Amino acid sequence: MKEKAARIYLTATPDEKWKRNFRTGKQKGIIVSGRYHRHPLPVPLFSWCGNWKKSLHHKKIPRVLLQWLKMYVNKKYPIFLFVPHVRYIEEIGLLLKGLDHRIDGVHAEDPMRKEKVEAFRKGDIPLLVTTTILERGVIVKNLQVAVLGAEEEIFSESALVQIAGRAGRSFEEPYGEVVYFHYGKTESMVRAKRHIQSMNKSAKEQGLID
């Protein structure tokens, strides 16, 4: 191994220390604010859904979320529904079977994880209920993204930015809606939205967006 060599870090969500060091010049770096297809990042919308845990306790999906999901299922657009904990996956998946019996859920320890993700890519599964394990590495045309319980602590600014980044990645269909369904807006939600808006603004100024 060489005694002197460059080490390059690549991240979509640098932490506050990295941002501070970059601003003050302690750490060198560049910001790539545009996507290869030259379209802006989808900016998340906030939608208050009430006490969603209470709704689930009564075996119901919050109405505003259900209406949103139904709209895109009917349009035959693929959907990721992110939930804050694995314990909600099966419960919500079963409650949503009325929309389409093929709706399924997946988590990190799921032995059928790869098969389900591939079926989702092919369109055989219209909606996947999942956790933050599917933040990265999945590109699906026309993908719509929802987060239930976006106010939960696990959904940090970086996690919410990564989740929003699942939408609009396809070259053929570089658009998609991202909605944070919540029972109280958090600072992480606000920062995530601001982060994405800032990236779009920077990309526009650099001529990286058509």
Task: List PLM regions with ranges.
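Post-DEXD/H (motif II) to motif III coupling segment of the RecA-like Helicase ATP-binding lobe
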Residues: 1-48
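Loop/turn-to-beta-strand initiation segments
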Residues: 3-10, 77-78, 124-127
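Conserved segment of the helicase C-terminal RecA-like domain
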Residues: 15-17, 157, 164-197
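Conserved interdomain linker/interface between the two RecA-like ATPase lobes of SF2 helicase motors
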Residues: 28-89, 93, 100-103, 207
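Amphipathic alpha-helical transducer elements in NTP-driven molecular machines
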Residues: 66, 110-114, 127, 131, ...
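Conserved helicase motor
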Residues: 84-87, 103-117, 129-137
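A short beta-strand element within the Helicase C-terminal
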Residues: 127-129, 135-151, 161, 177-180
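Non-catalytic, charged low-complexity extensions flanking SF2 helicase motor domains
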Residues: 198-210
